Amino acid sequence: MSGLSGPPTRRGPFPLALLLLFLLGPSLVLAISFHLPINSRKCLREEIHKDLLVTGAYEISDQSGGAGGLRSHLKITDSAGHILYSKEDATKGKFAFTTEDYDMFEVCFESKGTGRIPDQLVILDMKHGVEAKNYEEIAKVEKLKPLEVELRRLEDLSESIVNDFAYMEKREEEMRDTNESTNTRVLYFSIFSMFCLIGLATWQVFYLRRFFKAKKLIE
C-alpha cells in the first residue's frame, strides 16, 4: 500500500549557487589579519588566473599615537616586478586591478619608524573573479530582479568553474608532455651511456691485449 505524496517540489538555483560558492569561496577570497612590527616587511602571495578583476580593502591601525615617525607602505607587484598598486603612508583604502596573465601576485606591507613602537595591526580583504564583482551595482544599472541577479551570479560561478577545469586540463597536458619529453631524453641518454660503456670495454680489451703482447705474456 503506497502512501500519499504531494506534488514534487521544484528546486531553484539557490542550492546550486550555494554549493558553487562553497567550492569556489576559499580560492576567490583572501581575508587575513596580522601584526606588522616596526621596520619590518611582510608579503602575501597568491596565484590568480588571467583576465580577472581583483579588488581589495586594507586597514593599518597605528597604535603609536604619531610617535617615532611611523610610516607604512603598501605595494602590489606581479612575478616580473611590475607595480600594480603602490601607496605611501598607507592607513586605510581600497585598490583594484585586472590581471593580464595567469601569474603569482605579491602584496607587501612595510613599516618604517624609530623608537619603541607597538606592532601595527594589518587587516586585508582581497577578492577576485566572481566575488570581486559588485552585483548590487550591476542590478541597478541593468535593472535586474533579485532572481535575475542570482542567476547572473550563478552563471559567472559556472563560467569560473569551467575556466578552472580548462586550466587544470591544460596544466595536465603540459605536465604530460614534459614527462614524455623527459622519458625520451632519459631513453636517449641510457642508449648513449650503453654505447659508451661498450666502447670503453672494447678499448680496454684491445689495450690489455697489446700490453700482454708487449710483455710477451701472450702470443
UniProtKB/Swiss-Prot annotation:
Q: Which residues cross the membrane?
A: 186-206
Give the organism the record lists: Pongo abelii
Q: Which residues form the signal peptide?
A: 1-31
Q: Membrane side Cytoplasmic: which residues?
A: 207-219
InterPro entries documented for this protein: Emp24-like (IPR015720), GOLD_dom (IPR009038)
Q: What does this protein do?
A: Cargo receptor involved in protein vesicular trafficking and quality control in the endoplasmic reticulum (ER) and Golgi. The p24 protein family is a group of transmembrane proteins that bind coat protein complex I/COPI and coat protein complex II/COPII involved in vesicular trafficking between the membranes. Acts at the lumenal side for incorporation of secretory cargo molecules into transport vesicles and involved in vesicle coat formation at the cytoplasmic side.
The protein's topology relative to the membrane is: Single-pass type I membrane protein
Question: Which stretch carries the motif COPI vesicle coat-binding?
Answer: 211-219
Domain commentary: The GOLD domain is required for proper p24 heterooligomeric complex formation and efficient transport of GPI-anchored proteins.
The record's subcellular locations are: Endoplasmic reticulum membrane; Endoplasmic reticulum-Golgi intermediate compartment membrane; Golgi apparatus membrane; Golgi apparatus, cis-Golgi network membrane
Question: In the UniProt record, what gene is named as encoding this protein?
Answer: TMED10
Where do the segments described as Interaction with COPG1 lie? 204-219
Q: Which GO terms describe its molecular function?
A: protein transmembrane transporter activity
Top-level taxon of the source organism: Eukaryota
Give the PANTHER family listed for this entry: TRANSMEMBRANE EMP24 DOMAIN-CONTAINING PROTEIN (PTHR22811)
* Protein's UniProt name: Transmembrane emp24 domain-containing protein 10
Biological process per Gene Ontology, one example term: positive regulation of protein secretion
Example of a GO cellular component annotation carried by this entry: COPI-coated vesicle
